[in-house]
Amino acid sequence: MNFKKAGIFRRSSEGSEQPEVQNDSGGMLAVWGSPGSGKTVTAVKIAKMLSAKKKNVILLLCDMTAPMLPCICSPDELECERSLGNILAAARIGENLIKHNLVTLKRSNYLTVLGLLKGENEYSIPPFTEKQAIELLDGLRQIAPYVIVDCGSYIANDILSAVALMEADSVLRLANCDLKSISYFSSQLPLLKDAKWDADKQYKVAAKAVPHPTHRKCVGRYGKRITTTRETAEATAVSLVPIGGD
């Protein structure tokens, strides 16, 4: 899998069509979408899939309203408990600081996680800037070939998620097939209409799609879908680390 903008998913507009060659060079994928669309579950599954293929991957959990690390991985599965807040509190963010605060897992040699700990919130750390967020993302790129960013929905007040959407090689955009999601994107997409925002790097997915005329219209608009099945409905209960490890 390759999330690079110049990789297998990018359409070439120069000259005649050439057969695309897959280049497994990694990249940064931001998973973003409307509230309740399954962003974290999707990000976790992608990270687990890559680690199962023995690819070094970092999963960055941006949500500071409801920190997701305690939700997807129990404390006894962690080799250490370190916080994303320790990094963002630094005036200058370097590679060594990031490595020191990455959370490693007992049963996975290829997957590391970064996020806030249980009980922490955005007021647990000093205010940080766009520059610090960029330094963090650049540092993660240097440490691992694959970086999966689980973005929060409220990007107007979430600097880290907003910067990740700008800096990522590709964005997986999830939307539920309901009016709330339509209202959400009508409100939030104008915030991203900036010179730095590349709409071509988005891959739109209709999440939690079920057989229904309205949902079929939504799926037709987005092109891809995540169908609601028993497996996807139970996905939120799946631990980040499988019992058997990688």
Spans of features found by a protein language model:
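Extreme N-terminal, non-catalytic leader segments
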Residues: M1-W32
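Walker A/P-loop phosphate-binding motif and the immediately C-terminal alpha-helix
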Residues: V21-T65, L69, L140
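Phosphate-binding loop that captures ATP/GTP phosphates
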Residues: K53, V57-T112
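Short loop/turn segments at strand-loop or loop-helix junctions that form parts
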Residues: D63, V113-G119, T229-A233
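Cytosolic-facing regulatory segments adjacent to core modules
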Residues: E95-K106, T112-I155
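A short helix-to-beta-strand connector/capping loop
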Residues: T104-V113, D198-K201, K224
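Conserved catalytic-core segment of NTP-binding enzymes
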Residues: E135, R141-Q142, Y146, C151-T227, ...
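C-terminal boundary of histidine-terminating zinc-finger modules
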Residues: T236-D246
